[in-house]
Structures are given as C-alpha cells and as structure tokens.
C-alpha cells in the first residue's frame, strides 16, 4: 500500500476546520433565507452539452470529464465524454431555469389553480462544491465550494439593493467590522471608454487592466494600458474619471459632469443614483459601501451594476456579484430569456480572513458540557439523567465513556478529553457528591470549580451557557 494522501488540489476538512466552515455556511444560509432566497441543489455531474461552450477555450480545458466504466476502453484520443463535473453554479442555474421556468404545477393553496413551479422572480441560493482541473497552488484548488445567491426574472434595481444589503448584513453577522462593498456600473465604464475615444474592441482588455488598480499603483496600470496601444489623451480621459474622490454622491456627480456626452454612462450613473437612494431608504449603513469607479470586474457577461466586497484582511476580495441580463439566455441555449443579478461569497477567503482577524476566537467545538461518567452504583444513573436533561434543554452535552468506578485517574482522563475538545464545562458526580446531593461544576476556561445542587444542575448550567 502506498503513502496515504489526497489528490493534489483537494483537501480533507477535519472537525476543527469543519466547525468553522459550517459556522460560516450556516450564517450565510440564515441571511439568505431571511431575504426570501430558497435553496437549490443540482447534480455534481452535468451533461457535456450543458457545459460545452460556456467558459471559453481556456475554461473548457479545466473541466473534468466523467468516464463511465463501460466506455473506458472505447474512448479515442481527444474524444469528449458525454458527462462532466460541474465547473460553477451559474450554468446549472441557467439549465434549471430553462427546464422548469415555465413548468406549471397545482397551487398548494388551491389545487384547482395552476402556478409556476419556479416563482418569478426566482430567488435561489446554492452552496455546493465545484471542480476545475487547475494547477494546484496557494489558494487555488481543484475542488472548492461556491456560495451563490441569485435573482432571476427582474430588472428592478431593488434586486441589487437587496443583494448589497444582504452582503452587508452577512459580513456583520460573521463579525467583520472593517469591510467595504465597492460598487460600479458596466454601462458607466462602457461610456467612459467610448468618450475616451478607445475602440469598442479594446473594452475587455482595458477593463482587465483597470481592475488591477486595487493591487497595482496607477502609474503601473497606465504603463500597461499604454502597452496596449492607448495614447496619452485616452489615458488622461480614463484616469480623470477613475480618480474621482469624495462621497459616493460626489463621485457620481463628478462622473455625470465629465461623461455628459455618453448616453451609456448617464444611464449607468442614473441607476447607481437610484441604488444609493434605495440603500439609504432600506437603512443600510453607508460606512459599509461606496461607489468606486475603478472597479471593473473582469467577467464580460456583466451588463449593469457590479459590486465587490473587500475586508481589512490581506486575502483579496471576499465576495462579488452584479447584474447579468443576457447570460441566462446564452447559458440555457435560448430556452429562457430572463434578466438576472447575483452575488457570490468566497468561502475559503472568508475563512482565511476570519482566521487572520481572530473572529473564530470565541467559536467552540461541538460540545458545551461533558458529564463525567463513573460506574459506581447509583452514580451512573444520575449521570444518564443529567446528560439527558441537558440535551432536552438544548445544551450540546456529551457523556464520558469511562465505565470503571470513580478513581482520580479516570477523572483525569475524562477531563483531558474535555480540554482537548474545547468544552465550556465539565460536570463531576462521584460517590461523595452523590451523598451530598451535589455536583461539581468545573469551568474549563478559568479552571474554577464549584458545588451546585444536583436537583437543579441541568437548568443552572443551561442558563449560564445561554446568558
């Protein structure tokens, strides 16, 4: 048998890591549901025809193909398989909307009536792994989770408003204090490029360079753009707008004046102005979002508002999203022509940021209380009753697995386990405690121990944990 290990670019998540991951995922799910999003799950394996042509030539090379055992010996070199592992969650969403978007079912409230199986707008969240045959490296994996929330079927800027509000609430719930949702608009950027006299064919490559301004100084980005054929006047026109500073309203007012000759830019500015008004009306704290005209989001399928969340931690973007009104049509093969807008949370980067910022310090492992168990007559039954009562009170309680009569060594072994697992309290009921009608309650953080009445031990411990 060879050395034990995992495939490159994949990971095991041991209990201490899983507790953190589940904490983040559960927090996101709670926020998603609070905003009316419903869960969706799709198969890991998709038909190749569903994925083909959706990710460009380079992206397609990274798709994992699935070979059935019956065709192992019949596939020729370069021949495609019929199935592949999903590459992202957006294409499966488009397939689902194309398959079920117009499907009618009986209305649960009135079986005589028909209603759409997928409400319109369709608000879904999806948290599942995806696979890419990338070269493994720092922060780059072949298997990783995406956490997406999308709204399909509405052009209203209220969609962007709620997604940004949701994003702010989610990061605050996770304990982040210093983070910013940067906001821009693809039509504003299109108008900027247009008014600067840059050919439309260069739009994608120019935006790719502009998007590096959060990592590189402006001079380096200017040099890169000059290398792509932009002259001094074009560069000045770009950076005059990109460099605008002040409040979000002041930045938009400056852009409105500088880009007065562009219909596309004015349309984008108008939508962003409305978005700011809605965010304020919804009570979203403006300390957590701002207009940033250097935000470009390299993906060319965005058509309207775009946004990206950055934190004080040095991990890069921890979330991003935007409006993509043509993508569902393209990805569904023309079966569904619906506007859409969504956001995605970077689970691995969020975990890295929270670890860096010490936001997991108060997060304990699965157990809260360990009831030490001893096999003395009568003691064992009391331990059973105590652990059952704690669980009924909603406390995460474990029973020690020591079956011998009370000994100091047996107590040390069980307390060692409690410390390893990070319990808050240990409850000790030995023959002496039994005789006194008491239990010894040990605080495993402070190491202090006290005697409490055995009859009310469960309620007392539950109360302390919930206070």
Swiss-Prot record:
One of its GO terms (cellular component) is cytoplasm. GO terms for biological process: histidyl-tRNA aminoacylation. Keywords: Aminoacyl-tRNA synthetase, ATP-binding, Cytoplasm, Ligase, Nucleotide-binding, Protein biosynthesis. CDD domains: HisRS-like_core. The keyword ATP-binding applies. SUPFAM superfamilies: Class II aaRS ABD-related, Class II aaRS and biotin synthetases. Its EC number is 6.1.1.21. It is found in: Cytoplasm. Belongs to the class-II aminoacyl-tRNA synthetase family. This is Histidine--tRNA ligase. It comes from Gloeobacter violaceus (strain ATCC 29082 / PCC 7421). The gene is hisS.
């Amino acid at each position: 048998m060879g050395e034990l290990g995992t495939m490159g670019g994949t990971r095991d998540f041991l209990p201490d890591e899983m507790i953190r991951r589940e904490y983040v995922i559960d927090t996101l799910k709670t926020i998603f549901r609070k905003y009316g999003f419903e869960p969706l799950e799709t198969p890991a394996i998709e038909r190749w025809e569903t994925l083909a042509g959706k990710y460009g030539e380079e992206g397609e090379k990274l798709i994992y193909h699935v070979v059935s055992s019956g065709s192992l010996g019949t596939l020729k070199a370069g021949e495609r398989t019929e199935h592949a592992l999903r590459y992202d969650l957006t294409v499966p969403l488009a397939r689902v909307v194309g398959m079920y978007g117009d499907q009618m079912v009986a209305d649960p409230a009135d079986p005589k009536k028909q209603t759409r199986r997928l409400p319109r707008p369709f608000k879904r969240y999806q948290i599942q792994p995806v696979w890419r045959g990338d070269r493994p490296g720092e922060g780059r994996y072949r298997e990783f989770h995406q956490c997406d929330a999308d709204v399909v079927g509405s052009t209203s800027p209220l969609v962007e408003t709620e997604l940004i509000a949701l994003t702010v609430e989610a990061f605050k719930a996770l304990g982040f204090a210093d983070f910013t949702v940067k906001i821009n608009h693809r039509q504003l950027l299109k108008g900027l490029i247009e008014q600067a006299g840059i050919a439309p064919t260069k739009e994608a490559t120019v935006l790719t360079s502009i998007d590096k301004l959060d990592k590189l100084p402006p001079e380096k980005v200017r040099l890169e753009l000059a290398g792509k054929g932009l002259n001094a006047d074009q560069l000045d026109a770009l950076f005059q707008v990109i460099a605008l500073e002040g409040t979000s309203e002041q930045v938009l007012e400056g852009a409105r004046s500088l880009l007065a000759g562009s219909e596309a830019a004015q349309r984008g500015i108008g939508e962003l102005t409305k978005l700011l008004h809605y965010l304020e009306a919804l009570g979203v704290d403006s300390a957590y979002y701002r207009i940033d005209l250097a935000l470009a989001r390299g993906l060319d399928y965005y058509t309207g508002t775009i946004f990206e969340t950055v934190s004080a931690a040095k991990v890069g973007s921890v979330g991003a999203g935007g409006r993509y009104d043509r993508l569902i049509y393209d990805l569904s093969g023309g079966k569904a022509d619906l506007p859409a807008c969504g956001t995605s949370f970077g689970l691995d980067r969020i975990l890295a940021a929270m670890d860096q910022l010490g936001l997991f310090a108060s997060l304990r492992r699965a157990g809260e209380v360990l009831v030490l168990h001893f096999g003395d007559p009568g003691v064992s039954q009391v331990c059973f009753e105590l652990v059952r009562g704690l669980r009924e009170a909603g406390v995460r309680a474990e029973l020690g697995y020591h079956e011998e009569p009370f000994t100091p060594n047996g107590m040390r072994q069980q307390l060692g386990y409690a410390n390893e697992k990070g319990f808050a309290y240990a409850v000790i009921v030995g023959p002496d405690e039994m005789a006194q009608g008491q239990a010894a309650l040990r605080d495993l953080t402070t190491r202090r121990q006290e005697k409490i009445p055995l009859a009310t031990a469960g309620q007392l411990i539950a109360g302390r944990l919930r206070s």
